Amino acid sequence: MLKLLLGDPNARKLKRYQPLVSDINLLEEDIAPLSDEDLRRRTSEFRQQLENAGSLERQRPVLDQLLPEAFAIVREAGKRVLGMRHFDVQLLGGMVLHDGQIAEMKTGEGKTLVATLPSYLNALTGRGVHVVTVNDYLARRDAEWMGQVHRFLGLSVGLIQQDMSPAERRQNYGCDVTYATNSELGFDYLRDNMATDISEVVQREFQYCVIDEVDSILVDEARTPLIISGQVERPQEKYNQAAALALQLDRAAEMSKDGIDPEGDYEVDEKQRSVILTDEGYAKAESILGVEDLFNAADPWAHYVTNALKAKELFIKDVNYITRDNEVVIVDEFTGRVMPGRRWSDGLHQAVEAKESMPIQPETQTLASITYQNFFLLYPRLAGMTGTAKTEEVEFEKTYKLEVTVVPTNRTRARRDLVDQVYKTETGKWRAVAQETAEVHRTGRPVLVGTTSVEKSEVLSALLQEEGIPHNLLNAKPENVEREAEIVAQAGRTGAVTIATNMAGRGTDIILGGNTDYMARLKVREALLPRLVRPEEGHRPPVPLQREASSGFAAAASAPAKPPSEARALGRLYPCELSPDTDAALADVARELVKLWGDRTLTVLELEDRISSAAEKAPSEDAGIMQLRQVLAQIRADYDAVISTEQASVRETGGLHVIGTERHESRRVDNQLRGRAGRQGDPGSTRFFLSLEDNLLRIFGGDRVAGLMNAFRVEEDMPIESGMLTRSLEGAQKKVETYYYDMRKQVFEYDEVMNNQRRAVYVERRRVLEGRDLKKQVLGYGERTMDDIVEAYVNPELPPEEWDLSHLTNKVKEFVYLLQDLEPQQLAGLSMEELKAFLHEQLRIAYDLKEAEIEQLKPGLMREAERFFILQQIDSLWREHLQSMDALRESVGLRGYGQKDPLIEYKNEGYDMFLEMMTQVRRNVIYSMFMFQPQPAPAQEDEAVV
């Protein structure tokens, strides 16, 4: 009703931008005839105008005035360099981003191109713009591909990759537009704030940031803090003993009610992802381990036992992690990709290693940490784009103060979303999925099936194998990950069947009829691998692993193997043989490249990098890449001839059919899977198959669903369609989203306390690092320390003759040994304020004496010592403080039982602990400075040794 009266707020926002779009379209005629040099000259003129404006606040209105002309220039540059012209809806998206909002743009609408508009405009200030993507490959691709537009217009483009040195990072952060991943940005920020010299700092002050796949970074990853840690030694045998103990303890069938423990040793709360021992469980664990108390501070066991039980019950192999090369590797629950190098904290990873009988790696101690939420709030202006943001609109507004604007699609959507089919059991559901896949496959339409875990994708694969349907499997298992590009390249071909685990973050579009660009790359890779890559690197032929009888399933051993010719036909990757001319050209290029790049000297990654550069339009100095580019175009032309007819037939039969096999905890991830079909106005359809045994319904659907299960006396393979059930599903998803939102909000609120402390420490640290007024700072520390001593030993309510001046002078001498001749009589008769002023004066005199003594040895050594001691104290005490804050956070939750708000308790106590830490820093620095006795350098050296 409100919408009818007031109109759609989203439409109102878009209407506001419409006049600007018209202005840009009018400017197009004036800008098209300009020469390349003229366009670059405009960039310099814009920069001059902004420089004249001065501060960032004053530059903002100037940027808004320049917007129409700047966008028109970027559109023209895009046409000239990339052969791509920004559509009107892309201009709208650019304006939304420039205004510091989130632009929701559907899959395939060219989000990457949209980012060039606001990043060019905001880079004109010279303060740097960061464009953030989810992985290194996408950052590199965008920097090479979209970076051409910026370079063409005279801006510098930087790229941050995982293996770069600090010097390379500093150079790239110094560019006008820098492409990077969210984790690299965050870790560089933390490393900068651990630097011991200003020359080690790589980032400059933040200004403007555009995040691609913003929901993935600001919502999905918001619960995971970025942590830099150092190793600490802990007894490894405890993990193994705890893992063995976990196997001897029995899980309770239900949760405790009204404080009464259930039968069993421990209860598992899947919703909270926690494990709690019952009283019986505590007694049993203590007796098996032969200890009196699991919580004994001298020999603690509780932490190890709880982690071992979590590893047993909540961390499932092939769902949460996979094992390879004798290591436990985490699987990202949102993207289905493995995350090598990432480890769970608090001893959890070690518990999983013990459970899997793998070598246990040392535990770590946090040296610095920040959440993505607080990290991205450091940017004065933040913007983001994604295909699905509307469902999380409230969170974006409350946590990040970011509005969401839905940008219309360029062409009308032709996708059909079919009604969900719900089955009573999981077995019935999987049979139905296999049946639907088979039926659609026989019509010649491509099918994409999304599963939620590696294990489930293997189950479906086995069922399709029984039906004799050729298919490709894409999950976190190493043998499949390597084939990701090939599998996605042909997922849109006639009759292709692809099973993918969490298709959410995968950056490749599924193109109807097949992706000829990818197929051409793979053909080139196949021809060049044996000639250019080192033999020890090893390589596999790029014919995808069709899941045939020989694919390693135990049940498959007795199944009759397909004749080789048929199996090969099913797995054929390329749409046709190359023409003799193209074949000869490819062989020639391969020979030339051996001469240019050496015989089998590259790694697989280096070769793939070069093929990627050749496949994109970025200008290159390398003759080899230019030759590769020509042959790629030739191969693509051969394939296009065949694929264009295949594309037409796939369109006619109805396009890609997407099947979801379980509702994800977030509606957004379901929408991302649906968005794979019907991109850019293509036809397509989607359907979800669910069962009452699915995790989502089991954990969050609650008793209503259990009641429904008993009420439906239906066969396994009969779909249930009921309004109440659909509402239950929607309700369950909303419940989960709210639950996780509350968790993220809680993480945010608790980290907010840490964030204020972190900022204060980092500001202090940076001031020291830059060497500003170091002497003044140390004297300030000393004066505060003197004040603390006076306040500790002088009670203003007592008469002055009762003040404990002898203890006071002794305490002053402990800190400042140069005041050894200070006597209590000198202080007699002074008021409290006079006492403080007198000690400040004495401290200054003593400090000047100390400085003269040190400077005689080596000029400038005093300033170096000041910097060294302040940084050393801040760093070591901040590390201890982080540990204490973690411990406080763990324990503060219990205060809820005492009718106290845990967050307020955490804020108050955390603040007191922080003040105590800063006091400790001041005292330690003063003590260290006066005790500092540098050794005179040997005669042949002219440097003093600290």
From Swiss-Prot:
GO terms for biological process: intracellular protein transmembrane transport; protein import; protein targeting; protein transport by the Sec complex. It holds the Pfam family SecA_PP_bind. One of its GO terms (cellular component) is cell envelope Sec protein transport complex. The gene is secA. GO terms for molecular function: ATP binding; protein-exporting ATPase activity. It is an enzyme of class 7 (translocase). Its EC number is 7.4.2.8. It is found in: Cell inner membrane; Cellular thylakoid membrane; Cytoplasm. It comes from Synechococcus sp. (strain RCC307). SUPFAM superfamilies: Helical scaffold and wing domains of SecA, P-loop containing nucleoside triphosphate hydrolases, Pre-protein crosslinking domain of SecA. Belongs to the SecA family. The keyword Acetylation does not apply. It catalyses: ATP + H2O + cellular proteinSide 1 = ADP + phosphate + cellular proteinSide 2. This is Protein translocase subunit SecA. Part of the Sec protein translocase complex. Interacts with the SecYEG preprotein conducting channel. Has a central role in coupling the hydrolysis of ATP to the transfer of proteins into and across the cell membrane, serving as an ATP-driven molecular motor driving the stepwise translocation of polypeptide chains across the membrane. Keywords: ATP-binding, Cell inner membrane, Cell membrane, Cytoplasm, Membrane, Nucleotide-binding, Protein transport, Thylakoid, Translocase, Translocation, Transport. ATP binds at Q90, G108, E109, G110, K111, T112, D509. It is a peripheral membrane protein. Monomer and homodimer. Part of the essential Sec protein translocation apparatus which comprises SecA, SecYEG and auxiliary proteins SecDF. Other proteins may also be involved.
